[in-house]
C-alpha cells in the first residue's frame, strides 16, 4: 500500500499546484518540527503580501463548517463518509479542491487525533486531515529559520495518522458530510501555488545580502588564532561555527590575543622573546608616579614592535598575496582572450536566436483586430491568441459530441455557437469556469474539458458484446461518448479480444 503521508497539500501556499511534492519527508520523532530536503516548505502568508506572491498563486473557493456544540459537531464528524479506498479519498479531495467543493470540518475542541480516537469521534472512512507544522528551512537563503506550513495527511478510521503536526480538522468533499450539516457551511477561500520555484514565496525567502557568501558558518565569527594552539594544523585560520559553546571560546581567544606578543616560527628554529624585555620593563608599584607609568608603557610598546618586526624579517618564505588580474603578462592576456572567445560567440548566437524567435512568434500569433473567430473542418473557434489554446481545442472537440447543456439558457447559446459562432456563449462559459482552471498565462485543458462535460448531459447508448463468450455490456451517457461512432477493441474477462 502506498504511503499516503507522502502526498500533502500546503496551505496557504503550496509548492506545487494543486498537490504538494511527493518527496516531502516527515520526521515522526518530533511532531511539532520537521526538516525538508533542500527546499523551503510552504509558509502561511497573508494576502497583504505584495510582489510576485499574488501572481504565482490562485484563489480557490471552498467552504468550512465552524465549530458547533460539542455533541452536534461530534455527530457530524461520525457521519462523514468519503470512500473506503484511501487512494480514492485523496483523488476525490483533490478534485473537490480544484472545483471549489471542499469543506473544512473543524472539531469542537483543539485535541490531537489520538485523543479524538479515544473519544470515538472520527469519520467512518479514511479522510484527509489538516495539520499545522513548523518546518525548518535548509536552503540557507531565508532570513527566518522556520516556516508555518498547513498540510494534508490521511487519517484512518481507527485513528492512525500517516502524517504529523498539530491537528486542525478534516478536509473532505461537500458530498461526504450529511445533508443536515450543509445549512451551517460558511464560504471560505484558500490560495494555492500555480508554479515557479519549489518552496514558498515569502518576504524573506531567497533574500540575502549581496556581499554575504554562502557558507555553513557566519563570516563574522572567523578569528585568527596562534599556531601554538595546534602544531598539526597547516592553516592558522580557525573557523568557529555559530554555536554558544564555541562563541565563548572565540571570545577568550580574541581577548587573549590583545595581551600576547606576536611570536613567529621558522623551520628548525624557534624565536623567543629577548631578555631585554624583562630588564627594560620595570615592575610597577603603587608608589610610582603617573609620569613613570607612562614611560613604562612606552617602553613596553617599543619592545613589542621590535620583536614583531624581527619576527617578520626572519620568515623569508612568506610571500605577499597578489591579484592575478593586475599582473601585466601578454601570455596570460592572450590565454584569457582565447578562453572567453567561445563564450562570447555563444552569447551572441543566443541573442540572435532569441530575436529571430520573438519576431517569428509575433508574426505567427498576429491576428487582425477585426477578426474574432475562424472556422476549421466545419467547427467554429475563437481567434488565435497566445493564451487561449486550451479554450480553442476544447470547443472544437466538444462540437463533435452529441451533448446538451443542463441549463436551458446555455443550451440556446450553444446551438447559436454551433450554427455561426456566438461570442456571448464563450464569455459566459469562461466566466462560469472555476478560477483555478483559467490562469493569466493560459489554462488547464483537461480540467476545463472535465468542467465542460460536467455541465452537460448525454443521450447516448453503446452496446458491447464479446464474440467468444457472448457477454454484453451496455453503456449510457458519458461512458458511451468515448465509444460513440468508433470501433474500439476491448479485452473481455475471458481473455478474448472482442469488438463493438
From Swiss-Prot:
Zinc finger (C4-type): 466-494
Keyword Phosphoprotein attached: no
Catalytic residues as annotated in Swiss-Prot or TrEMBL: 389
Domain CoV Nsp1 globular: 54-196
Domain Peptidase C16: 352-500
Gene Ontology BP term (one): symbiont-mediated suppression of host gene expression
Keywords: Decay of host mRNAs by virus, Eukaryotic host gene expression shutoff by virus, Eukaryotic host translation shutoff by virus, Host gene expression shutoff by virus, Host mRNA suppression by virus, Host-virus interaction, Hydrolase, Metal-binding, Methyltransferase, Protease, RNA-binding, Thiol protease, Transferase, Zinc, Zinc-finger
GO MF term set: cysteine-type peptidase activity; methyltransferase activity; RNA binding; RNA-directed RNA polymerase activity; zinc ion binding
Functional summary from the UniProt entry: The replicase polyprotein of coronaviruses is a multifunctional protein: it contains the activities necessary for the transcription of negative stranded RNA, leader RNA, subgenomic mRNAs and progeny virion RNA as well as proteinases responsible for the cleavage of the polyprotein into functional products.
Similarity remark: Belongs to the coronaviruses polyprotein 1ab family.
Name listed for the protein in its UniProt record: Replicase polyprotein 1ab
Annotated source species: Murine coronavirus (strain defective JHM)
